Amino acid sequence: MAKYLGIDVGATWTRAILVDEGGSVLSRAKIRTGVSPVAEIAEVVAGWDFDAVGVGSIGPMDLKTGVVVNSPNSPSRRFPLVEPLKKFKRPVVVANDCVAAVWGEYVFKYHVDNMAYLTLSTGVGVGAIVNGVLLLGKDGNAHELGHAVIDFKSPRRCGCGGLGHFEAFVGGANMPSFYQEVAGEGPLLPEEIFKRAREGYRKAVEFLDVWLDALAAGVATILAAYDPELLIVGGSIALNNWDIVGRELPKRLVKYLGVRGAEIRPASFGDDEVAIGAAALAYKTPETLKKFGYPR
């Protein structure tokens, strides 16, 4: 049976997994994301045997060149995805991390022709399949709705430099300063905010009320843009706090939606979500990626 290497380049961690054609995980590896994360994880998996490799990476990226460009949350704002893997002499496919994640859900789990994926982690990202077609855009960044403006009067600056972006309010890297702004104390890390809210600390509860409304406003934009039947939500902030996010998000969406909503479910593969999606890209490469010359 063929085996596929999936690499997940995140802002904090870079992961690699080896899967078979059914999506079963055979091996795992994880390192801190460095200035050249694909080259660094390639050294770790040098002894693994695989037939093709996929990479799901934080963006934005230039799919034509296979390079991440101007990434706001990583140690290096620009780094190659394809070049460090050529030494393996295996087909290589790359895409944005959330594009990989939604493709993994499509191939290995749900097979829904209209679905979207949202990650809530260090940053915010989106991937979408519409009428069975994986959306990419001219450079591979059709899904960068973390940079959709949800408050055009806000002075809050996103890591990319823009004002009022979805990610500037709900992304993990921005939550401490947002908490400080709303609560008048802190800053606090996301895990501490949720912990204190569960303990009933008033300022944390009041902050999450604002944060969840910002989340719902951004999700309403995703649903309006892609009209999915199913929205998958992943990333550490969402999955570690699904008791709150999963309960509150559908309720708060109602006031922002002018279109029919979508079923909302947590990501199927936990921390492996993007890496499994990357392996799925290598296993069943979507037609839209083939137009960019993948596999290479």
From Swiss-Prot:
It catalyses: D-glucose + ATP = D-glucose 6-phosphate + ADP + H(+). The keyword Transcription regulation does not apply. One of its GO terms (molecular function) is N-acylmannosamine kinase activity. Optimum temperature is 95 degrees Celsius. Highly thermostable. Gene3D superfamilies: 3.30.420.40. Optimum pH is 8.0-8.5. Its cofactor is a divalent metal cation. GO terms for biological process: glucose metabolic process. InterPro entries: ATPase_NBD (IPR043129), GK_pyrobaculum-type (IPR054671), ROK (IPR000600). Keywords: ATP-binding, Carbohydrate metabolism, Glucose metabolism, Kinase, Magnesium, Nucleotide-binding, Transferase. It is an enzyme of class 2 (transferase). It comes from the Archaea. Homodimer. Catalyzes the phosphorylation of D-glucose to D-glucose 6-phosphate using ATP as the phosphate donor. Has a broad hexose specificity, and in addition to glucose, which shows the highest catalytic efficiency, it can also phosphorylate fructose, mannose, galactose and sorbitol. Can also use CTP, GTP or UTP as phosphoryl donor. Belongs to the ROK (NagC/XylR) family. PANTHER family: BIFUNCTIONAL UDP-N-ACETYLGLUCOSAMINE 2-EPIMERASE_N-ACETYLMANNOSAMINE KINASE (PTHR18964:SF149), ROK (REPRESSOR, ORF, KINASE) FAMILY (PTHR18964). This is Glucokinase.
